[in-house]
Swiss-Prot record:
Disulfide bonds: none annotated. Belongs to the MinE family. GO terms for biological process: cell division; regulation of division septum assembly. This is Cell division topological specificity factor. It comes from Blochmanniella pennsylvanica (strain BPEN). The gene is minE.
Length: 87
């Protein structure tokens, strides 16, 4: 039984958690059918925390949510990483 658990159940990574949150945001947005970026400050904070675990001193320039039409929204995240040697 332990062997089955090893192959079928894995620990959730920060990427898995972020993906699930984004899916919930999108589904909630589709249900309410309104354009309210109430989640952007928390999403930005989560992205910075996750990226900071792997890369030191990330600099986020912008996080934007654009509405293309009634059913489509695009989340744009522009992040620039500076190499310590080139600074």
């Amino acid at each position: 039984m332990v062997l089955v658990n090893f192959f079928f159940f894995r620990k959730k990574t920060p990427a898995d958690i972020a993906k699930k949150r984004l899916q919930e945001i999108v589904s909630d947005h589709n249900i309410r059918n309104n354009f309210a970026p109430y989640f952007l400050p928390q999403l930005k904070k989560d992205l910075v925390q996750t990226i900071s675990k792997y890369i030191h001193n990330p600099r986020i320039l912008s996080i934007q949510l654009e509405k293309k039409d009634n059913n489509t929204s695009i989340l744009k995240c522009k992040i620039i990483f500076f190499n310590e040697e080139t600074q």
